[in-house]
Curated annotation (Swiss-Prot):
Listed name of the protein: Recombination protein RecR
Gene Ontology MF: a single term: DNA binding
Record PROSITE patterns: TOPRIM
Biological function: May play a role in DNA repair. It seems to be involved in an RecBC-independent recombinational process of DNA repair. It may act with RecF and RecO.
InterPro entries registered for this protein in UniProt: DNA_Rcmb_RecR (IPR000093), Hlx-hairpin-Hlx_DNA-bd_motif (IPR003583), Rcmb_RecR (IPR023627), Rcmb_RecR_Znf (IPR015967), TOPRIM_dom (IPR006171), TOPRIM_RecR (IPR034137)
PANTHER family xref list: RECOMBINATION PROTEIN RECR (PTHR30446:SF0)
Gene: recR
SUPFAM superfamilies, per the entry: Recombination protein RecR
A biological-process GO annotation: DNA recombination
Family: Belongs to the RecR family.
SMART domains documented for this protein: HhH1 (SM00278), TOPRIM (SM00493)
Keyword terms: DNA damage, DNA recombination, DNA repair, Metal-binding, Zinc, Zinc-finger
NCBIfam families, alphabetized: recR
Length: 200
C-alpha cells in the first residue's frame, strides 16, 4: 500500500480485516470516513469503543448483552420449558426477528469442526447440560446450521441430551419462500422433504 499515506494505509488494512470486507470495500469505507465530517468518524469510533466496553456474554445463555442476565433470559413471559440451541449470537437475532419462538436460548459459540480443531470442549456444551439439570426444560430445539459441522453438532448434542429424559427436536431446513426447486441443492431438498408437515 505504498500509494497511500501511512495512516490511510493502516485504516484500509484494519477495515479489510473485518469479515466480508475485501480490499476494495475497505478502501471505499476508508475514503468515505476521511471525506465525511469528522463527527461521523468520531461517532463510529465511540460506538465501537462503547460496544467493546459495555457488551459481554450473558452468564445464562451466552448471548451478547449489556445486562446480566440478558433481556431474553430476564423476561418472565418467556417459556422456561423450551430451550433453543444455536451456534452464534447472530442466530438469536435471526430467530427473534421472526417473532415465532417464545422460549429461551443457549448459544454454543460455534460448532464441532475437527478440520478447524474445534471439539465439543471448545463449545458451551457443559453449560448447556448444567442448565438441563434443573428439570425445568422439557424440550430442546437444536437450531444449528444446515452444514456438516452443524449437523455433527446437533447429533452429538442429541446423544447427550436424550438420556436426560428431555425431548430433543431439530428445526426443519427447507426452501426459502420464493425459491425455485431447480436452484435448491440436494441437502435443502432432502431436509425440506424430511421436515414436511401435513397441511391443514
Amino acid at each position: 500500500m505504498d500509494y497511500y499515506a501511512k495512516p490511510v494505509a493502516r485504516l484500509i488494512e484494519q477495515l479489510a480485516r473485518l469479515p466480508g470486507i475485501g480490499p476494495k470495500t475497505a478502501q471505499r469505507l476508508a475514503f468515505y470516513l476521511l471525506n465525511a465530517p469528522l463527527e461521523v468518524a468520531l461517532n463510529l469510533a465511540r460506538a465501537v469503543e462503547e460496544a467493546r466496553q459495555a457488551v459481554r456474554y450473558c452468564s445464562v445463555c451466552g448471548n451478547l448483552t449489556d445486562t446480566d442476565p440478558c433481556f431474553i433470559c430476564g423476561d418472565d413471559r418467556r417459556r422456561r420449558d423450551l430451550l433453543c440451541v444455536v451456534e452464534r449470537p447472530r442466530d438469536v437475532v435471526a430467530l427473534e426477528k421472526a417473532r415465532v419462538f417464545k422460549g429461551l436460548y443457549h448459544v454454543l459459540h460455534g460448532s464441532i469442526s475437527p478440520v478447524e480443531g474445534i471439539g465439543p470442549e471448545q463449545l458451551r456444551i457443559r453449560e448447556l447440560l448444567k442448565r438441563l439439570e434443573g428439570g425445568t426444560v422439557r424440550e430442546v430445539i437444536l437450531a444449528t446450521n444446515p452444514t456438516v459441522e452443524g449437523e455433527t453438532t446437533a447429533l452429538y448434542l442429541a446423544g447427550l441430551i436424550k438420556p436426560l429424559g428431555v425431548s430433543v427436536t431439530r428445526i426443519a431446513h427447507g426452501l426459502p419462500v420464493g425459491a425455485d426447486l431447480e436452484y435448491a441443492d440436494e441437502m435443502t431438498l432432502s431436509k425440506a422433504l424430511e421436515g414436511r408437515r401435513e397441511m391443514k
